[in-house]
Amino acid sequence: MIIGVIGAMEQEVMLLSKQLAKLNIWQQARCNIYSGWLHGKKVVLVQSGIGKVSAALGCTLLLTNFEATLVINIGSAGGLSPALAVGDIIVSEEVQYHDVNVTAFGYDKGQMAQYPLLFPASPSLVALTKQLTEHTNINVVCGQIISGDIFINGGQELYKLKRRFPQAIAVDMEVTAIAQICYLFAVPFVGIRVITDIADSVSHKSFKDNLITVVSHLSLLVSDIIQAL
């Protein structure tokens, strides 16, 4: 088993990379790659950069160069549900684009041409994540995450998202692109995101203020998942 983990930003992968034994670090196509061992398992961790294209590139490297057998996407997200708070962890049951529109050709909003509307996460990885957090004080919510190349900062963008995608509980900029690559390679994936903001008019400030603190909880959870696999 080779476990692939991918995050967009240095802050999102830094703590997990420090846990890897026999660590090798290098760069390819502007992706920072960390290869090592954790809990007796081979782990390849990629810091891809922000956005859908960077995420798709990083995931493709994981699957072609390292033949990862599963992919865990980690990082931050903006909360869309009023029930969510900063520090809550979101586990993707399914993911979808919010900035894709080829409805002129009969597709639904958010559906890429020639692809399904929704990309489901691995049920077993979702179940394992839920199981590992049952007896903790971490609030874990499973549901739909939507992705696009927009940092949602309140206003009309937030209003449009909530109106067009009422089932979505969180928004990010990478996980659906990663899911699409995993779909092409028939490799199981799950997205695990921590809420850093609630996508409102001060979300940029909340994101900066909260990122380092809340990501520490996420790193511990991912380490537990790797141990349990």
UniProtKB/Swiss-Prot annotation:
Entry keyword Amino-acid biosynthesis: yes
Entry's EC annotation: 3.2.2.9
Pathway this chain belongs to: Amino-acid biosynthesis; L-methionine biosynthesis via salvage pathway; S-methyl-5-thio-alpha-D-ribose 1-phosphate from S-methyl-5'-thioadenosine (hydrolase route): step 1/2
Record field: catalytic activity: S-adenosyl-L-homocysteine + H2O = S-(5-deoxy-D-ribos-5-yl)-L-homocysteine + adenine; S-methyl-5'-thioadenosine + H2O = 5-(methylsulfanyl)-D-ribose + adenine; 5'-deoxyadenosine + H2O = 5-deoxy-D-ribose + adenine
Keywords: Amino-acid biosynthesis, Hydrolase, Methionine biosynthesis
Single biological process term from Gene Ontology: L-methionine salvage from methylthioadenosine
Binding site for substrate: 78, 152, 173-174
Catalytic site: 12 (proton acceptor), 197 (proton donor)
The protein's name: 5'-methylthioadenosine/S-adenosylhomocysteine nucleosidase
